[in-house]
Amino acid sequence: MVSKRVESLLNQLRTQGIVDERVLEAIALVPREKFVDEAFEHKAWENTALPIGQGQTISQPYMVARMTELLTLTPESRVLEIGTGSGYQTAILAHLVHHVCSVERIKSLQWQARRRLKQLDLHNVSTRHGDGWQGWQARAPFDAIIVTAAPPEIPTALLAQLDDDGVLVLPVGEEHQFLKRIRRRGNEFIIDTVEAVRFVPLVKGELA
């Protein structure tokens, strides 16, 4: 039995076009309040992005659901997340697939996310402190790659780490950003523009 706050959010997401019941179930199962600072706990189930420190944010639940839905995951999907952040998106993915790989450039965020995931008994996640622009070559190829910060252009390393028929979902742009869904067909990449978005930038090279 879900609470009224959770049910209200799920209804909002359905109204906004989220139809994948597995994604909605994962949203309901992951306690978002565990991924935000105490000062923002009362807003945890609102459909809004919230700050998590280090100039980063926990994405709006709609955007988490939308991007996850666009990945068209199966339990067997090999998934790479770029930008672990709070670990919230990671937790959603961990409820949907057997294993998740996640890269975070800010060490303190990586450790906090690992602690939260462990507290929730989500042990099917591998995290790495590294440059998201480079992906995770040692674990490639991936069926699905999701990027939770916006590069000015699509990182070529991520395209290279997509398996055939794999999907990359990411925001792209600087001042004006658009959510893109890219599917690999052999050596070709089919790019669809989904909607206008606003994300923090995907910082290149610089680890913190």
From Swiss-Prot:
EC number(s) per entry: 2.1.1.77
UniProt xrefs under SUPFAM superfamilies: S-adenosyl-L-methionine-dependent methyltransferases
Name this polypeptide is given: Protein-L-isoaspartate O-methyltransferase
Molecular function as annotated in GO: protein-L-isoaspartate (D-aspartate) O-methyltransferase activity
Catalytic activity: [protein]-L-isoaspartate + S-adenosyl-L-methionine = [protein]-L-isoaspartate alpha-methyl ester + S-adenosyl-L-homocysteine
Main location (coarse class): cytoplasm
GO CC terms, sorted: cytoplasm
Cellular compartments annotated: Cytoplasm
GO biological process terms held by the UniProt record: methylation; protein modification process; protein repair
UniProt entry keywords in alphabetical sequence: Cytoplasm, Methyltransferase, S-adenosyl-L-methionine, Transferase
Organism superkingdom: Bacteria
Active site: residue positions: S59
